[in-house]
A protein has these predicted regions:
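Hydrophobic alpha-helical transmembrane segments in multi-pass integral membrane proteins
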Residues: 266-269, 318-337, 390, 394, ...
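Transmembrane alpha-helix interface/packing and boundary motifs in multi-pass membrane proteins
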Residues: 40-48, 125-135, 171-182, 269-275, ...
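Juxtamembrane and boundary regions of transmembrane helices in multi-pass small-molecule transporters
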Residues: 1-17, 136-139, 157-161, 168-250, ...
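Membrane-embedded alpha-helical segments and adjacent helix-loop junctions characteristic
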Residues: 37, 51, 55-157, 311-312, ...
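Interfacial loop-to-helix junctions that mark the boundaries of transmembrane helices
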Residues: 22-30, 41-46, 69-79, 203-215, ...
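Juxtamembrane helix-boundary/capping and inter-helix hinge elements in multi-pass membrane proteins
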Residues: 63-66, 96-100, 109-113, 150-164, ...
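Flexible hinge motifs at transmembrane-helix junctions and intramembrane kinks/re-entrant loops
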Residues: 22-27, 36-55, 226, 252-257, ...
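Structural signature of hydrophobic alpha-helical transmembrane segments
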Residues: 18-33, 77-89, 139, 216-218, ...
């Protein structure tokens, strides 16, 4: 414990007390010291990730790494932060109404007694259920119990290959369906805000994000699903006597109808943003307001404030504040210039530059399990470096999101995964092996399919 506490303090002091390098302002050095401390805290998980965020905000203010406290609290003033609160509230309402579990049960019924069809439908549900239930953690919490019922009915042991395949996919691939949607939870929310800020572009609309990210993440989901199937293919034959599962759901209730109508109306507003021009945060906040209205909605204020998961709010706001401090202090530009000098020989070879960037992103992800910390660190660096070397910074930002969010290297590295791996008794070496496979898949898909596709939709690698 002493090491985990002492290391971030030592890193902070080492950066802030070092001689000021050429081109880096005093304020930039202080901002870099706070970011370095936050990165180590996120990587070691010495503090809860939300507490790390708040420590960083306080540190930015106390050591004058920003001009004033309003700059330190930049992330708390951004619409994207409240967009996240809105979609989490919508997900909570759908979950508590019972609608999400009913949808999952109906999907499983279609598989009958065929484990291969069950597996394929589960992969499809990772994408389909995201429209009603954005949080991968909540989806996993619902689906794991439903699929455990199926395994129990079929007489499949926890350590059997079929159960491991189902749970490995649920732990390692489930969240890929979320990131394809702007409303898919903390990863797309943080990533889209950072890329828009650093790219100097308008905030991503729901449809623009879907156009750019659905192809890479759905392809990674498909290929990742194939890898899991091949790893455990011996289990996709049912024991003798196993048959169709009949999951009881009961009659549909009024609260489920309400949840479905609210989710459908919100989705329609997101789908039609090209017509009305509303920020994605507005439909999310409308849904949140309806859900909390007495007599009309689905949640009381007490239920909302108790179950919202406020850590997500503080993590995203503090991540945006840290990234903004790096920008306005000049630290991000200095860091990028330093990296440019080390890869100057690759100038004129944009594909090789992005390949090196992707490899570096995978290594950063391996030592930084917290996705918000990873994004807050890697997106500013990747976009600034790419821009300095003549690459499209938006593509660089999107690329490191694809690489970083496609992998899980440790059982405890993602909230959506840890409890699933534990229940299925999946060992750490199996997760590491899957993480390596997913890294290769993500990079391969990115360079063979996604880059040409992005160029077709207006985001080429070189501007």
């Amino acid at each position: 414990m002493a090491f985990r506490v002492g290391l971030p303090i030592a890193v902070f002091l080492a950066v802030i007390l070092a001689p000021n390098p050429d081109g880096l302002t005093d304020q930039g050095q202080r901002a870099l010291a706070v970011m370095a401390m936050a990165v180590v805290l996120w990587a070691t998980e010495t503090l809860h990730m939300a507490v790390t965020g708040m420590v960083s905000i306080v540190a930015l203010t106390l050591i004058n790494a920003v001009d004033d406290v309003s700059v330190a609290l930049y992330g708390f003033s951004q619409p994207v932060t409240y967009f996240l609160v809105g979609i989490l509230t919508l997900g909570m309402a759908v979950h508590r109404s019972g609608l999400a579990e009913r949808m999952a049960a109906h999907l499983i019924r279609f598989a009958g007694g065929n484990p291969k069809l069950l597996y394929v439908q589960m992969l499809a549900a990772f994408a389909g259920l995201t429209f009603a239930l954005p949080s991968a953690s909540t989806r996993g919490a619902i689906m794991v119990h439903v699929y455990e019922q199926v395994m129990e009915h079929w007489g499949v042991e926890k350590t059997a290959p079929l159960n491991k395949a189902i749970m490995m996919a649920m732990g390692g691939l489930n969240r890929l369906g979320s990131t394809a949607l702007l409303a898919g939870g903390i990863t797309p929310v943080v990533a889209s805000a950072l890329i828009a800020d650093f790219g100097g572009i308008d905030a991503f609309s729901w449809t623009r994000w879907f156009i750019l990210m659905a192809v890479p993440f759905y392809l990674v989901l498909i290929f990742g699903g194939l890898v899991v199937y091949l790893m455990f293919r011996s289990g996709f034959t049912l024991p003798p006597g196993a048959g169709t599962v009949d999951l009881k759901t009961g009659p549909i209730q009024t609260k489920e109808i309400k949840a479905g109508l609210i989710a459908l109306g919100t989705a329609l507003l997101w789908f039609t943003d090209f017509a009305h021009g509303l920020s994605p945060a507005v439909p999310a906040l409308i849904a949140m307001t309806i859900i909390l209205l007495p007599g009309v909605g689905l949640l009381t204020w007490r239920e909302f404030e108790t179950n919202m998961g406020w850590a997500n709010f503080f993590v995203i706001a503090s991540s945006l504040s840290l990234a903004n401090a790096l920008i306005i202090s000049g630290a991000a530009a200095w860091f990028a210039d330093t990296l440019v000098g080390s890869v100057e020989g690759l100038r004129g070879h944009p594909t090789l530059i992005l390949l090196a960037m992707s490899g570096a992103a995978a290594m950063v992800r391996a030592v930084m399990p917290n996705i918000s910390g990873y994004l807050a660190f890697i997106i500013p660096v990747a976009m600034s470096t790419g821009s300095a070397l003549g690459l499209n910074p938006v593509v660089c930002g999107l690329a490191v999101v694809v690489v970083g969010d496609s992998v899980v290297y440790y059982p405890a590295s993602a909230t959506a995964s840890v409890f699933i791996y534990q229940r299925a008794e999946i060992r750490a070496p199996e997760v590491v092996r899957m993480g390596i496979f997913m890294t290769v898949i993500a990079v391969g898909v990115l360079f063979t399919i996604v880059l040409p596709y992005w160029s077709m939709v207006g985001e080429s690698l070189t501007p």
